[in-house]
């Protein structure tokens, strides 16, 4: 699997395209903004998008959805606990930015559910704290975790937004993510990649 990173939107959000190099099938994680850039990249390289995965519903992770879905009729997955945030401009913080945006077309997954996308077995891990329905996506075979705004390089997500909880977030990282193998590569929603082993040893917030 090849993972391509795009830093998009005013908040510098990491959007990922994970590609099966054998057949060009791919899925996207957190299309933050500028969907034309993503669509052009997919189209010119002959990739076949299968789905979008959302780690949570904050505006800076979802505002590229509408443009992307105009090009591709593909499902969008989020954790079921995140429905209220996706459907509220106040909760997803877009109203605070002056342009209210909501998304009601998600398919809702459950904690522990396995999504099969192009041969990749992707486990949904509920990691509340940054938002009540935030989640991470783990691909055991590839040793890869898409952590959204739950876990960053030497940091963790903010908890001062609606439905956030610092105690929940620390517990999510310690009890759900730090049980993964140390060599697991972490692709976060902002900043640089890291690993579970590095964060267990050096992250000052957990």
Task: Give, region by region, the residue ranges found by the protein language model.
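Conserved beta-strand hairpin/beta-sheet module of binuclear metal-dependent hydrolase folds
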Residues: 1-45, 137-148
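Active-site HxH/HxHxD metal-binding segment of metal-dependent hydrolases
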Residues: 33-116, 205
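Short acidic-hydrophobic surface loop/beta-edge motif
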Residues: 6, 18, 113-119
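A generic "binding-loop/recognition-motif" signal
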Residues: 11-12, 34, 58, 82, ...
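Metallo-beta-lactamase
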Residues: 93, 121-206
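Short Gly/Pro-enriched turn/cap motifs at secondary-structure boundaries
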Residues: 6-7, 104-106, 126-128
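Residue-level detector of beta-strand structural context in well-folded domains
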Residues: 16, 107, 112-113, 135, ...
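Active-site neighborhood of phospho(di)ester-bond hydrolases with catalytic His/Asp-centered motifs
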Residues: 28-29, 50-57, 76-79, 126-129, ...
């Amino acid at each position: 699997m090849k993972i391509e990173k795009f830093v998009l939107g005013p908040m510098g959000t990491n959007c990922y395209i994970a590609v099966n190099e054998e057949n060009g099938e791919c899925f996207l994680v957190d299309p933050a903004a500028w969907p034309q850039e993503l669509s052009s990249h997919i189209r010119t390289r002959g990739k076949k998008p299968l789905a979008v995965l959302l780690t949570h519903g904050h505006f800076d992770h979802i505002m590229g959805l509408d443009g992307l879905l105009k090009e591709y009729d593909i499902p969008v997955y989020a954790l079921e606990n995140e429905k209220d945030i996706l459907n509220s401009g106040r909760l997803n913080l877009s109203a605070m930015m002056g342009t209210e945006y909501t998304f009601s077309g998600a398919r809702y997954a459950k904690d522990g559910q396995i999504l099969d996308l192009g041969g990749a077995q992707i486990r949904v891990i509920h990691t509340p704290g940054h938002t009540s329905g935030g989640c991470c996506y783990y691909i055991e075979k590839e040793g890869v975790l898409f952590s959204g705004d739950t876990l960053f390089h030497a940091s963790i997500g903010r908890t001062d937004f609606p439905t956030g909880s610092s105690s929940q977030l620390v517990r999510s990282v310690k009890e759900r993510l730090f049980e993964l193998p140390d060599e697991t590569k972490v692709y976060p929603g902002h900043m640089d990649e890291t690993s579970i082993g590095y964060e267990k040893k050096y992250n000052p917030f957990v």
